[in-house]
Amino acid sequence: MDFTNYKAHELKNLISKKEASVEEVTKAHLENVKNIDEKVNAFLYIAEEEALNDAKALDEKLSKGEDIGLLGGAPLGIKDNISVKNMQNTCASKILEGYISPYDATVSESVKSQGGVILGKLNMDEFAMGSSTENSAYKITRNPWDLDRVPGGSSGGSAAAVASKEVPLALGTDTGGSVRQPASFCGIVGLKPTYGRVSRSGVVAYGSTLDQVGTLGRDVKDCALLTQVISGVDHRDFTTANINVPNYENSLSENIKGKKIALPKEFFKDGLDPKVQKAIYDALEVFKANGAEITEVSLPLADYAISAYYLLACAEASSNLARFDGVRYGHRSESVEDAVDVYFKSRSEAFGKEVKKRIMLGTYALSAGYYDAYYKKALKVRNLIKGEFENIFKDFDAIISPTAPTPAYKIGEKTENALEMYLGDIYTVPVNIAGIPAISLPCGVADGLPVGLQIMGNYFKEDTLFNLAYSYEQSTKWHEMHPNL
């Protein structure tokens, strides 16, 4: 029995029926990581000893008849900007090389308390700044569908690990599409929850008003399961909302009769690969056949989301990353003469090119004389975009679009063209600007590579997204596609 072929909810059932032990399941996945990861490069740290100890402890609980939680012994990986006690937390940056987290992020704590076995930390773009996982200071993660292509980013390690069956589940973070776009490129399911649905305590900040921890799995049910575990109010994060978390499993119904879906015409313009467009239109026919009503709408301000996003995110990054100064932790330059030198040289030596670029852009946007022209204006645009989404959700249950304008591209293809790379997030960024939830799920192939469909929902309506996504998934076979490694 190859446990790596099972999804998390299936492994949970096998373990609860005593048809497998947590240790057996953990060992099988660790073996897969050893065999596959030298090709894929999804992991930055493999926590073999910790995982086996946790698995044995869960088996011990089961032997006493104790409940081990919603995850029930399923393995998972954690993006390397989410703190896990006694594991590295480098954010794929040289500036945090060797840093070991002394505490758990709230989401890591939740995963452990609900019977999840953490197999290690996953690669990413440095400080989550990027769309391809080529900006990692340590290694380039490869797409399991084609090892010469990117897995997406910044949670590329998370998506690649799930797609290659190294883990059935993973946590990532999503600031402008960093869970959904890699999910699309790797042919899996990825959810970015509503801003405030999931705690950010213990997550290294990039853009504090945009960041959200998201979930990745090989099907909608697995994503719903992991989202259930990490959602809810947290006294350590005052931005979490004290709003009831529904039982997401109850929303996994194929019945979507009467659901109203909006189709924004601005998301189907120049730059969209015709094969991706066809996959989305084919998917719309499935939603119609299942009883949903689809209407074309206009979201004209969505065109300004990318511009507003890069001003806001970079401004927040400029502030958030000021703490990495070579004084308290992380890299410290050895060739220094005074305190200013420590700060300047440590950051110059250890931050990567993309991180430096975004810090400079953000500092410029916040500087005297430019604040009103750039940052303040971007905040106004953000409010207008939020208003547009809120108006649509008065009449509709969801909005559908492509997740990305193209399938996965070749490694190195867009590294020298920043604008082209940034425009790859054109469909995902508006979601973070507005703070709404969105899910990406596989809906077809283009040139043998997965295509993702994005469903956006109203605030705290993740259950509606799971309902629509599950209905589509059960009517198609795309989620059963797997890469051959």
UniProtKB/Swiss-Prot annotation:
User: Which Pfam families has this protein been placed in?
Assistant: Amidase
What do the Gene Ontology cellular component annotations say?
glutamyl-tRNA(Gln) amidotransferase complex
Q: Which UniProt keywords apply?
A: ATP-binding, Ligase, Nucleotide-binding, Protein biosynthesis
Q: Which reaction does it catalyse?
A: L-glutamyl-tRNA(Gln) + L-glutamine + ATP + H2O = L-glutaminyl-tRNA(Gln) + L-glutamate + ADP + phosphate + H(+)
Q: What is its EC number?
A: 6.3.5.7
Broadest EC class?
ligase
Entry-linked SUPFAM superfamilies = Amidase signature (AS) enzymes
Q: Name one GO molecular function term.
A: ATP binding
Any one of the GO BP annotations: translation
| Catalytic-site annotation from UniProt | K79 (charge relay system), S154 (charge relay system), S178 (acyl-ester intermediate)
Q: How does it assemble?
A: Heterotrimer of A, B and C subunits.
Which PANTHER family does the protein's record reference?
GLUTAMYL-TRNA(GLN) AMIDOTRANSFERASE SUBUNIT A, TRANSAMIDASE
What does this chain do?
A: Allows the formation of correctly charged Gln-tRNA(Gln) through the transamidation of misacylated Glu-tRNA(Gln) in organisms which lack glutaminyl-tRNA synthetase. The reaction takes place in the presence of glutamine and ATP through an activated gamma-phospho-Glu-tRNA(Gln).
Concerning NCBIfam families, the annotation shows: gatA
Please state which protein family the record places this protein in: Belongs to the amidase family. GatA subfamily.
The name this protein goes by in its record: Glutamyl-tRNA(Gln) amidotransferase subunit A
Q: Which organism is it from?
A: Clostridium botulinum (strain Eklund 17B / Type B)
Gene this chain is encoded by: gatA
